[in-house]
């Protein structure tokens, strides 16, 4: 499977059986810059924690960098 990986946001091969993920969360600059984003691949979908959104998928390049909605 191929997944987008941060910080370069490039598509890279991940080991067999892995899933792609997109993890987003707010930090001190969230209202100005938007949510922080981490893209990658993992053996299993990362555990969800309070304040962190995680989406996992299992097709090539299914985790593109999310677009920020403009007001």
From Swiss-Prot:
<feature type="site" description="Binds to both neuronal alpha-7/CHRNA7 and Torpedo AChRs">
    <location>
        <position position="33"/>
    </location>
</feature>
<keyword id="KW-0528">Neurotoxin</keyword>
<feature type="site" description="Binds to alpha-7/CHRNA7 AChR">
    <location>
        <position position="28"/>
    </location>
</feature>
<feature type="site" description="Binds to both neuronal alpha-7/CHRNA7 and Torpedo AChRs">
    <location>
        <position position="27"/>
    </location>
</feature>
<protein>
    <recommendedName>
        <fullName>Alpha-cobratoxin</fullName>
    </recommendedName>
</protein>
<feature type="disulfide bond">
    <location>
        <begin position="14"/>
        <end position="41"/>
    </location>
</feature>
<dbReference type="InterPro" id="IPR045860">
    <property type="entry name" value="Snake_toxin-like_sf"/>
</dbReference>
<comment type="subunit">
    <text>Monomer, homo- or heterodimer with cytotoxins 1 (P60305), 2 (AC P01445), and 3 (AC P01446); disulfide-linked.</text>
</comment>
<keyword id="KW-0629">Postsynaptic neurotoxin</keyword>
<keyword id="KW-0008">Acetylcholine receptor inhibiting toxin</keyword>
<feature type="site" description="Binds to both neuronal alpha-7/CHRNA7 and Torpedo AChRs">
    <location>
        <position position="25"/>
    </location>
</feature>
<dbReference type="GO" id="GO:0005576">
    <property type="term" value="C:extracellular region"/>
</dbReference>
<dbReference type="Pfam" id="PF21947">
    <property type="entry name" value="Toxin_cobra-type"/>
</dbReference>
<dbReference type="GO" id="GO:0090729">
    <property type="term" value="F:toxin activity"/>
</dbReference>
<dbReference type="InterPro" id="IPR054131">
    <property type="entry name" value="Toxin_cobra-type"/>
</dbReference>
<feature type="disulfide bond" description="In monomer, partial">
    <location>
        <begin position="3"/>
        <end position="20"/>
    </location>
</feature>
<keyword id="KW-0964">Secreted</keyword>
<comment type="similarity">
    <text>Belongs to the three-finger toxin family. Long-chain subfamily. Type II alpha-neurotoxin sub-subfamily.</text>
</comment>
<feature type="site" description="Binds to both neuronal alpha-7/CHRNA7 and Torpedo AChRs">
    <location>
        <position position="65"/>
    </location>
</feature>
<feature type="site" description="Binds to both neuronal alpha-7/CHRNA7 and Torpedo AChRs, may be important for inhibition of GABA(A) receptors">
    <location>
        <position position="36"/>
    </location>
</feature>
<comment type="function">
    <text>Homodimer: binds with high affinity (but lower than the monomeric form) to muscular (IC(50)=9.7 nM) and with low affinity to neuronal alpha-7/CHRNA7 nAChRs (IC(50)=1370 nM). However, it acquires (compared to the monomeric form) the capacity to block alpha-3/beta-2 (CHRNA3/CHRNB2) nAChRs.</text>
</comment>
<dbReference type="InterPro" id="IPR018354">
    <property type="entry name" value="Snake_toxin_con_site"/>
</dbReference>
<dbReference type="GO" id="GO:0030550">
    <property type="term" value="F:acetylcholine receptor inhibitor activity"/>
</dbReference>
<feature type="site" description="Binds to both neuronal alpha-7/CHRNA7 and Torpedo AChRs">
    <location>
        <position position="29"/>
    </location>
</feature>
<feature type="site" description="Binds to Torpedo AChR">
    <location>
        <position position="49"/>
    </location>
</feature>
<comment type="function">
    <text>Monomer: binds with high affinity to muscular (alpha-1-beta-1-gamma-delta/CHRNA1-CHRNB1-CHRNG-CHRND) nAChR (tested on Torpedo californica, Kd=0.2-4.5 nM) and neuronal alpha-7/CHRNA7 nicotinic acetylcholine receptors (Kd=13-105 nM). Also inhibits GABA(A) channels.</text>
</comment>
<feature type="site" description="Binds to alpha-7/CHRNA7 AChR">
    <location>
        <position position="35"/>
    </location>
</feature>
<feature type="disulfide bond">
    <location>
        <begin position="57"/>
        <end position="62"/>
    </location>
</feature>
<keyword id="KW-1015">Disulfide bond</keyword>
<dbReference type="InterPro" id="IPR003571">
    <property type="entry name" value="Snake_3FTx"/>
</dbReference>
<feature type="disulfide bond">
    <location>
        <begin position="45"/>
        <end position="56"/>
    </location>
</feature>
<dbReference type="GO" id="GO:0099106">
    <property type="term" value="F:ion channel regulator activity"/>
</dbReference>
<feature type="disulfide bond">
    <location>
        <begin position="26"/>
        <end position="30"/>
    </location>
</feature>
<keyword id="KW-0872">Ion channel impairing toxin</keyword>
<keyword id="KW-0800">Toxin</keyword>
<feature type="site" description="Binds to Torpedo AChR">
    <location>
        <position position="23"/>
    </location>
</feature>
């Amino acid at each position: 499977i191929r997944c987008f990986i941060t910080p370069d946001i490039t598509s890279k091969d991940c080991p067999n059986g892995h899933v792609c993920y997109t993890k987003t969360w707010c930090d001190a600059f969230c209202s100005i810059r938007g949510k922080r984003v981490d893209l990658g691949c993992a053996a299993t979908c990362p555990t969800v924690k309070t304040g962190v959104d995680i989406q996992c998928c299992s097709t090539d390049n299914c985790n593109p960098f999310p677009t920020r909605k403009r007001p």
